[in-house]
Amino acid sequence: MASLKDVKIKIAGVRKTKQITKAMNMVASAKLRGAQIKIEHFRPYAEKFQDVISNLATRSDETVHKLLEKRTNGTSCIFILITSDRGLCGIFNTMLIIKALELAKQKTTKGKKVSFICIGRKGRDAIKKTHYPILSDYSDKFTRDYQLASHISEKVIDGYLTVNMDEVVLIYGQFINAMRQIVGFSTLLPIHPKPLDKEQLEKYSEYIYEPGVAILLSELLPKFVTTQIYRGFLDTDASENAARMTAMDNATRNCDELIGNLTRLYNKTRQASITSELIDIVSGAEALK
């Protein structure tokens, strides 16, 4: 049985850990509120932007812009993987990495060459351990703002237009609510406009586009790609903080449980020590008779 001193040291250590996890939970909770506001305000804009692109695309064919053309004979594809730079957020990064590698394997089995653009240290470190090349790494010191999204957008669009590329896939953490985050993934290029329902088609039918649909698409499609990447940044940021808040809350609860178990062990050990001393005293008294 452990000594009283050892048990007390363990209890003190767990209490210090609890203080850390509780503080991290509070920090993650505060960051989540800000991140949640950002993504909830940005989503309506991104969705309306997609409606505009879909409306323009229905009034033209794929050949009007190369970013709309479906390709089947491409030899390569790029995966944009957005993860966190830091850990202690449960299985959040793991599920993103697993999904990315799963999708990459599907492409390689079809004879496609897969390469990665990594945003986030956790994703970068995981991909480094595989045979997939990393084209660009935006981890640690990079601020995930609209400017970075625009830079990445220009890079992948240039690659898509100049290289025999099949598609560009975006993988990110999709924020549902504080308790639920899932893996979000979508084909970034070629752009697949979502089908419009009858009501939407009638709504946009009387629109007159100047200077023309083709010119508008050439201006808006690159911005649409940037918007989708930036939305991935915001979604992942909110998901990361929500996952960390939940993980630290669970860790704090586990600390409470462990402190309870160790306290019971301490009391049991102390009682055993007292009983042993009483037995020694009684035995000594009996021996003196």
Curated annotation (Swiss-Prot):
Swiss-Prot/TrEMBL keywords: ATP synthesis, Cell membrane, CF(1), Hydrogen ion transport, Ion transport, Membrane, Transport
Main location per the UniProt record: membrane
GO MF annotations, alphabetized: ATP binding; proton-transporting ATP synthase activity, rotational mechanism
GO CC, alphabetical: plasma membrane; proton-transporting ATP synthase complex
Pfam family for this entry, one: ATP-synt
CDD domains: F1-ATPase_gamma
Role description: Produces ATP from ADP in the presence of a proton gradient across the membrane. The gamma chain is believed to be important in regulating ATPase activity and the flow of protons through the CF(0) complex.
Protein name per the record: ATP synthase gamma chain
